[in-house]
């Protein structure tokens, strides 16, 4: 029977490989840009531009796959310790806004799923909730709108980082884009310069699963 430790061990090769691909992203992007500058015809330029854009899509797919692995780990094996003071305050503020707005999409009580209220706080939300919303945005990209809970998490991230650099964004309403890599950045899992993203990922998940890896 699989437990938290065996899940982490069995998914480690995939997770580490995905982080390795992310670590190479910067070089791939730079090479794609150089190819654009060296284009000798309109046809070559169009091809190189397409390749340049595809590297961004690849980055989002890789990041989304990492979020999926983390999501399953938390959903199945995280050990909740109760909602933090920040999480409870966040819930109360959202419920206040719902009561004060006749146009609120959510008519009932807003509540964060306790299974994902785990890990260190990022702003006023626990790490598990950031994984939750990031994974759902990636997996339900084709839908017109996300559920309220997911949108609220992204709005919170957008309030913390309204104008992040390097092509990152948490704004769900500015065109149709994946935000998987931006979520990894918010989690602190993107240090490709020193290749520390995987170690940060493993440390955070080991903490919420209460295991040593």
Residue ranges and their predicted role:
Residues 122-150:
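Histidine-centered, metal-coordinating catalytic motifs and their short helical/loop contexts
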Residues 1-121, 164-213:
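Amphipathic alpha-helical interface segments
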Residues 156-165:
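Short secondary-structure subsegments characteristic of cysteine-rich extracellular domains
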């Amino acid at each position: 029977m699989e437990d938290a430790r065996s899940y982490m061990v069995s998914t480690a090769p995939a997770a580490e490989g995905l982080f390795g691909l992310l670590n190479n992203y910067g070089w791939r992007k730079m090479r794609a840009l150089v190819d654009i500058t060296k284009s000798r015809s309109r046809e070559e330029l169009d091809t190189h531009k397409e390749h340049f854009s595809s590297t961004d899509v690849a980055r989002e797919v890789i990041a989304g796959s990492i979020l999926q692995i983390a999501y399953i780990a938390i959903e199945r094996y995280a050990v909740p310790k109760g909602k933090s003071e920040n999480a409870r305050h966040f819930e109360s503020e959202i419920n206040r806004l719902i009561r004060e707005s006749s146009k609120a999409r959510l008519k009932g009580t807003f509540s964060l799923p306790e299974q994902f209220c785990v890990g260190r706080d990022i702003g006023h939300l626990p790490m598990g909730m950031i994984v939750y919303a990031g994974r759902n945005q990636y997996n339900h990209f084709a839908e017109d709108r996300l559920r309220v809970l997911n949108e609220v998490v992204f709005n919170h991230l957008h309030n913390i980082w309204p104008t992040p650099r390097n092509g990152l964004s948490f704004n769900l309403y500015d065109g149709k884009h994946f935000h998987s890599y931006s979520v990894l950045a918010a989690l602190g899992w993107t240090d490709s310069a020193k290749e520390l993203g995987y170690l940060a990922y493993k440390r955070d998940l080991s903490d919420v699963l209460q295991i040593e890896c």
